[in-house]
């Protein structure tokens, strides 16, 4: 496959639709760029439209300054509003980054905040032909020789790995602390996690931001191990990774100013040990027998991103690089009228300048051949975007940039501003762990089943309506094949759709089943057994559920044969609490009261009575449950292993039903009378036809699973 060497993804995702709203609220303008991705061609008009809220007027003069590379002013002015709108415009004949700083009228104190560039101002960012930006100075002539000698010196130090197993915070994941020896009697401390059991796994190394010192969180590595990675997360400092916070607070103050240590000598720089530690961590992962022998991902943010650039530049074993707002890029930039980047070395001092050039990621970049994903913010004055572009542009392997024109540094940004790189990182990690090329377009899913219930009656070629003659799960209803309980509806009954499946629980005291058993309620259940069965894929249903304590609607998948050996996937269940739904899996050793279950609470303002899409992505090694495309739970093969056999490689069929009461509702609501799990208030609801499930559609899709 041929993969383009550069890809640009705009950081829109709703961030730029209303853009750059100040913290001031209703009377302040919003700013919308002419180009959503903030990227322009040489000589092209660069512009933003400022818009006041409807009916508002400017209470004084809004002024702005346009700065090339965030430093030199190339224009300024006052916003001139007409019909509630004003323009900021400029152009540039050469590649550059631009920062516009907007200030409010005198007396306005609630304008701007950290996420817009600082209190009392709003920053706007733009890039002009950024893929042509280069580092401000060439690398030293002996740069490669210097680092080759340091790697030889490191190779002479035995690794002496000390791995101590500890308690994991996730099922089916093994967790350990680790210590490796480094140069000058220093160490690399970290945490290691892997899927439990035998196997060989792709590796990922996480590199951290560095100030102030802090303990590493277990979940940072165990979450990756739960996805199928051999994961290592290391401290940037020569300190243990899992001590109480008080330990880090008591460290010498100089460590909090680590960027000032050894700045006058390349052989004494604090970053020498840090960079070699990252290199050693990569080599250690490659030496482990549980590494898959193919894939090593290095990833980090801010100072972690700086280290990641270096690790990928020094070590060709790195196959994938993922960085966000990386620090330290093009440290000589201030000498050339560009924004500086942390570590903010005083490069006006000749000795500091000489040292800094050996630790600048821009000088490692041409050696990076890994597939690379780089995120950067256009108004980031911690990790200056021009420097990040200058590194990105030198990477020789396939690469992708995620520009975020409205984002400052990650610790100041909003979740919405950082969402583009967070989303793309998740997509990359998912592709890599499943052996896919992250640059390859996702295969279009193939629809293997669909029913939108628009016919006049239920399509019996797809569905069988089931009847029951005995009590199961202590449920209080009998399932009957009756249009009173299950049918296709149109018009107002369909809840605004062009047709829907209606399943309704009804009061029918003294109902006798063919087997002679008595029930006071009837309801509907249908399945696709023997008509539509599939192995792996995405099963989804758009549904609207009733709120009533003890009502038990469900959308689930089941294999043919003896339960629980055949495996059960509960895509959605609810027992009457309108604020949440649950997802679960059942199999041999983890059935009934399964430990593999998760409740998910709806966002504010939503509940089960609205239309929602409930889905499961069923894969050979995992199941991902979603509500409205939002992941709510993930069950992996490794999570199942401690409880029993994985029972999810066999065909499954679809089931939709509405139970009334039963063991699960009773376990939640504690009701035993008048019916198990079903209180009197819900009995009245059923008697007044208030217990109904609507299903707009059910769909199953499949794609290439590798």
What are these model-derived regions, one by one?
Residues 34, 38, 155-198:
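N-terminal cap/lid segment of alpha/beta-hydrolase-fold proteins
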Residues 257-302:
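Gly/Ser-rich "nucleophile elbow"/oxyanion-hole loop immediately N-terminal to the catalytic nucleophile
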Residues 200-209:
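Short beta-strand element of the alpha/beta-hydrolase
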Residues 305-351, 403, 413:
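Hydrolase active-site cap/lid region
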Residues 210-276, 330-341:
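Cap/lid segment of the alpha/beta-hydrolase catalytic domain
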């Amino acid at each position: 496959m041929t993969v383009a060497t550069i890809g640009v993804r705009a950081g829109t995702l709703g961030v730029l639709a209303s853009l750059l709203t100040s913290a001031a609220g209703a009377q302040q303008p919003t700013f919308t760029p002419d180009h959503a991705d903030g990227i322009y061609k040489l000589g092209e008009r660069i512009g933003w439209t400022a818009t006041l809220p409807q009916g508002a007027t400017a209470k004084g003069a809004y002024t702005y300054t346009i700065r090339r590379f965030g430093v030199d002013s190339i224009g300024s002015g006052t916003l001139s509003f007409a019909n509630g709108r004003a323009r900021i415009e400029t152009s540039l004949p050469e590649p550059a980054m631009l920062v516009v700083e907007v200030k409010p009228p005198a007396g306005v104190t609630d304008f701007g905040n950290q996420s817009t560039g600082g209190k009392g101002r709003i920053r706007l960012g733009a890039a002009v032909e950024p893929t042509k930006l280069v580092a401000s100075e060439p690398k030293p002539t002996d740069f490669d020789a210097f680092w080759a000698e340091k790697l030889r010196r490191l190779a002479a130090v035995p690794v002496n790995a000390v791995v101590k197993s500890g308690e994991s915070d996730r099922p089916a994941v093994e967790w350990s602390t680790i210590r490796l020896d480094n140069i000058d009697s220093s160490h690399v401390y970290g945490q290691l996690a892997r899927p439990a059991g035998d196997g060989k796994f792709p590796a990922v190394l996480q590199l951290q931001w560095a100030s102030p010192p802090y303990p590493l969180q277990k979940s940072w590595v165990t979450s990756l191990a739960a996805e199928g990675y051999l994961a290592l997360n290391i401290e940037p400092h020569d300190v243990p990774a899992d001590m109480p916070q008080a330990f880090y607070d008591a460290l010498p103050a100089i460590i909090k100013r680590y960027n000032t240590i050894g700045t006058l000598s390349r052989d004494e720089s604090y970053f020498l040990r840090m960079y070699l530690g990252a290199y050693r961590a990569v080599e250690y992962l490659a030496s482990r027998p549980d590494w898959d022998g193919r894939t090593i991902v290095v990833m980090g943010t801010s100072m972690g991103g700086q280290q990641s650039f270096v690790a990928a530049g020094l070590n060709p074993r790195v196959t994938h690089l993922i960085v966000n707002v990386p620090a330290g890029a093009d440290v000589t930039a201030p000498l050339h009228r560009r924004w500086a980047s942390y570590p903010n070395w005083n490069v006006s001092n000749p000795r500091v300048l000489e040292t800094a050039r050996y630790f600048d990621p821009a000088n490692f970049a041409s050696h990076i051949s890994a597939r690379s994903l780089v995120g950067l913010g256009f108004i980031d004055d911690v990790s200056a975007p021009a420097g990040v572009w200058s590194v990105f542009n030198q990477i020789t392997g396939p690469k992708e940039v995620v520009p975020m024109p409205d984002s400052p540094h990650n610790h100041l940004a909003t979740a919405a501003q950082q969402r583009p790189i967070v989303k793309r990182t998740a997509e990359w990690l998912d592709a890599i762990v499943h052996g896919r090329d992250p640059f390859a377009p996702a295969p279009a899913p193939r629809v293997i089943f669909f029913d939108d219930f628009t016919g006049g009656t239920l399509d019996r070629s797809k569905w069988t309506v089931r009847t029951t003659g005995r009590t199961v799960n202590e449920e209080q209803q009998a399932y009957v094949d009756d249009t009173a309980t299950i049918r296709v509806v149109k018009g107002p009954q369909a809840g605004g759709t062009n047709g829907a499946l209606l399943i309704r629980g009804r009061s029918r005291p003294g109902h006798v089943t063919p087997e002679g058993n008595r029930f006071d309620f009837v309801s509907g259940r249908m399945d696709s057994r023997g008509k539509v069965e599939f192995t792996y894929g995405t099963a989804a249903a758009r549904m609207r559920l009733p709120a009533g304590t003890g009502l038990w609607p469900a959308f689930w998948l089941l294999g043919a044969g003896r339960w629980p050996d055949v495996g059960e996937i509960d895509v959605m269940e609810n027992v009457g609490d309108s604020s949440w739904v649950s997802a679960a899996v059942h199999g041999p050793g983890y059935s009934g009261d399964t430990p593999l279950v998760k409740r998910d609470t709806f966002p504010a303002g939503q509940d089960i009575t609205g239309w929602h899409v409930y889905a499961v992505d069923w894969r050979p090694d995992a199941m991902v449950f979603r509500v409205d495309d939002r992941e709510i739970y993930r069950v992996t093969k490794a999570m199942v292993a401690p409880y029993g056999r994985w029972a999810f490689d066999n065909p499954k069929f679809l089931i939709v039903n509405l139970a009334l009461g039963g063991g699960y509702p009773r376990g939640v609501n504690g009701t035993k009378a008048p019916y198990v799990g079903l209180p009197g208030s819900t009995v009245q609801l059923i008697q007044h036809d208030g217990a109904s499930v609507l299903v707009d559609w059910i769909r199953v899709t499949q794609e290439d699973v590798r």
